[in-house]
Regions:
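Short pre-active-site segment immediately N-terminal to the catalytic Zn-binding motif
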Residues: 194-211, 227-233, 375-387, 404-408
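An active-site-proximal "capping" alpha-helix that borders the catalytic cofactor pocket
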Residues: 233-249, 409-424
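C-terminal motif of bacterial Sec signal peptides marking the signal peptidase cleavage site
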Residues: 22-25
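Bacterial signal peptide processing site
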Residues: 27-30
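Catalytic zinc-binding patch centered on the HExxH motif and its immediate surroundings
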Residues: 150-190, 358-379, 383
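Catalytic Zn2+-binding segment of zinc metalloproteases
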Residues: 217-231, 250-251, 393-408, 421-427
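A metal-dependent hydrolase signature that marks the N-terminal structural subdomain at the beginning
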Residues: 32-165, 307-365
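Long, well-structured alpha-helical subdomains associated
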Residues: 250-312, 425-496
Length: 496
């Protein structure tokens, strides 16, 4: 959150920095992480300019025209809470009949693990099958253009030519990264099998690399189809969308690792954690998007398939990511101090939920322990405090209304209600009374507004909450419900 009027010197730079992980994987043409950026950014930008300046007869990918990012306020989601609940209940009641899995050919890829080789084979089988929906014929990436970082040597034998620029593939660029490049030698895919693959396998076994590989192949398809006129952030979220479509396809066929509800949970959380650093501008070179938008794109693909993802070219998705507008926000990453979060945000949450009830919710609410709140604030950010209270007051509201609070349906409604609070804050701001800067004994009104990172803080709080400990396997649906409330407000939350 941020003040629109007053400066509070006691606000400390706590929050999202503690969990903004360095998994900013991928990019068409080559996108580097912070650690590799100093090595490669200038060279990669030169390569971009080379590609954009004139046609490439060896690999005609077209020109990268302006495709402005749509930073307008999202005009609403496409489903209501009751639709999400119906889908969950139907999946619990109806036995799933799997579709036949395709026969795959496991190609020898120098240095690649058997798991990654299988991921690549499955993703290529997916594109071979669904390409007809997009009216093109998928062409497999040449096995000699698939490079784990561990195989990139110092001898310069493995090159990527951008017409006048001939460069050896650089292991430093691949560090904790993955990328796709339109080299004259052929579309080239590089991934870090030393650090990144190990990290993903430890935290999201199987699923992390499957999502990474399927995302990169989204870029492969963009190049094969010459979809190179989008802004970077739209290209990246289209690749996220294609990745989500692959997850659904694999799940329908019982293809590992998408054979359990937990796999889909891991897919969403790993996507959330590969977001851009908080406060990044959406129009920046190599921008991927905040977690809120990247998860939305992944869920678009899972729910709607590759044809919908393809439409990103014509109608870019709504972008909620914003950059910092003041040096103060940048310094504290848009976060209030814990004391300000507790004293300003919590009463706002309480007032919002009380306005939804005909009786006081005080006797129904299970107040969180301060230690829990301080830990959330320190590891996630200021809005985690407000989100935790929103989830608890959602349960209090349900109980006061005589509704059930146990089970997946009520949990999804609480997530939607928490999102509706964010919707209200996004549209109207939060008016609070704070001590005047000129005279601390006097109070004056100021307005809190959502800052960059707040929506991601809400999702992260949700994915680590008791709601999911009590309802394992529904991260996908919980995040979707939160988004419905955030974009459509209270009317979408099926509140009696």
């Amino acid at each position: 959150m941020r003040h629109t009027g007053l400066v509070h010197p006691q606000s400390l730079p706590l929050g999202l920095a503690a969990i903004a992980l360095t998994l900013s994987a991928c990019g068409v043409f080559t996108e580097t992480t912070e650690r590799a950026g100093e090595v490669a950014d200038e060279r990669v930008q030169d390569a971009f300019e080379e590609i954009e300046s004139e046609p490439n007869e060896d690999f005609p990918i077209g020109t990268r025209e302006e495709n402005p990012v749509d930073e307008s306020t999202p005009d609403g989601s496409t489903e209501q809470l009751d639709e999400i609940i119906d889908d969950v209940e139907a999946s619990e009641e109806e036995p799933v009949e799997l579709l036949p899995a395709p026969e795959i050919t496991l190609r020898e890829i120098d240095g690649a693990t058997p798991e990654v080789i299988e991921h690549i084979a499955n993703v290529e089988a997916f594109w071979t099958e669904v390409a007809v929906e997009l009216d093109f014929e998928y062409v497999e990436v040449d096995v000699d253009r698939l490079f784990p970082r561990s195989t990139i040597g110092d001898d310069g034998e493995d090159t990527c030519s951008f017409r006048r620029i001939v460069e050896p593939l650089d292991a430093d660029v691949a560090e904790f990264n993955a990328y796709v490049a339109p080299c004259s030698e052929g579309i080239t895919v590089v991934w870090d099998d030393i650090l990144l693959e190990t990290d993903l396998e430890e935290r999201f076994p199987g699923v992390g690399m499957a999502m990474l590989i399927s995302h990169e192949w989204g870029h492969v398809v963009q190049l094969e189809r010459q979809q190179v006129n989008q802004s970077d952030i739209v290209a990246e979220q289209q690749a996220d969308c294609y990745s989500g479509a692959y997850a659904a396809w694999a799940e329908d066929r019982g293809i590992e690792p998408f054979t359990s509800d937990q796999a889909l949970d891991f897919a969403i959380i790993s996507t959330l954690e590969t977001r851009d650093a908080v406060g990044s501008r959406p129009e920046a070179f190599g921008a991927h998007g905040n977690g809120f938008d990247r998860v939305r794109a992944t869920q678009d693909g899972y729910d709607r398939g590759v044809t919908f993802c393809d439409g990103y070219d014509v109608t870019p998705p709504p972008v909620t990511q914003t950059g910092f507008t003041t040096a103060r926000d940048r310094q504290n990453e848009g976060n209030l101090s814990f004391d300000d979060s507790f004293e300003l945000l919590v009463p706002a949450v309480v007032d919002y939920y009380e306005s939804l009830s005909s009786e006081s919710l005080e006797e129904f609410v299970d107040e969180p322990d301060e230690r829990i709140l301080r830990n959330l604030h320190a590891t996630i950010g200021d809005l985690s405090v407000g989100t935790e209270y929103a989830l608890r007051y959602g349960a209090a509201l349900q109980e006061a209304n005589g509704d059930a609070i146990a089970g997946v349906g009520p949990a999804l409604q609480r997530a939607c209600l928490a999102g509706s609070f964010l919707n209200d804050a996004r549209l109207n701001g939060i008016e609070v009374e704070v001590p005047s800067i000129n005279d601390p004994t006097e109070l004056e009104l100021t307005t809190l507004t959502l800052s960059p990172g707040d929506l991601d803080e809400a999702i992260t709080t949700l994915t680590s909450s008791d709601e999911l400990l009590s309802n394992p396997g529904v991260v996908f649906e919980m995040v979707a419900a939160l988004r419905v409330g955030t974009l459509d407000g209270i009317d979408a939350c099926a509140l009696a």
